Amino acid sequence: MGIEAADFDKYDVVYVSNAEEHQYLDSYVPKKQIGTKALSSVLVSLADSGNGLKVSTYNINYCTAGMYKNALATAGVEDANVIVAGPFPLSGTAALVGTFEAYEKLTGKELDESVVDAAMDELVTTGDLEQSIDGDSNDVEAMIADLKGQIASGKIKTPEEMEQAIEKLADKYDLKLSDDDKQKLLGLMKKLQGLDLNWDSIKNQASAWAVSYTHLRAHETAAN
């Protein structure tokens, strides 16, 4: 990230322990994957209102920029620039915890624990899907953003409507979901629906995802 230890006094520095990683993630991630040390780092800066979330990663091999973006939006983080980095390839789970704590310190807004827990669940569910599905991570992340956007806009409300939406979006994004994958998604969406989230922000993020996804696919088509 280009920041030397001597420059730390220019920043608000938050340290995340490995114990905090386990506190947030043990319910969703095998302890072996979390490890015994918190090594990833994150730089968070606030952006002007309406700029949305921008995330970039370096040396992070489990969490993608899209995974962070979706989870952060769920937790209520908005209008921020986030850089996540590791000294060598690593999972990046500590950085997500650090991002939440840094955002709270920067804004003075305390994030609801149940919402943060749901964001962690979303991150891990997304990662599990990306590992189990023979597909592009962008497709999985766009589908989840799309699902959340439909809940935010009131297009889907009941579990039955969620199941139908999952089926339709799997086709839209050309993803082959197993029954277990579908149940994980359904469980996550039901959890999110039951929380007091910033649904306007989630709806805006879903729209931004749709635009970036369209540009990505158009670029790939042009390259081919």
Regions found by a protein language model. Give the residues of each.
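N-terminal Sec/ER secretory leader and immediately downstream segment
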Residues: 1-77
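Soluble oligomerization/assembly scaffold segments of membrane-associated complexes
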Residues: 73-175
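Catalytic-core signal marking the mid-to-C-terminal active-site face
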Residues: 155-213
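Conserved small/polar residues in nucleotide/adenosyl-binding loops
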Residues: 214-221
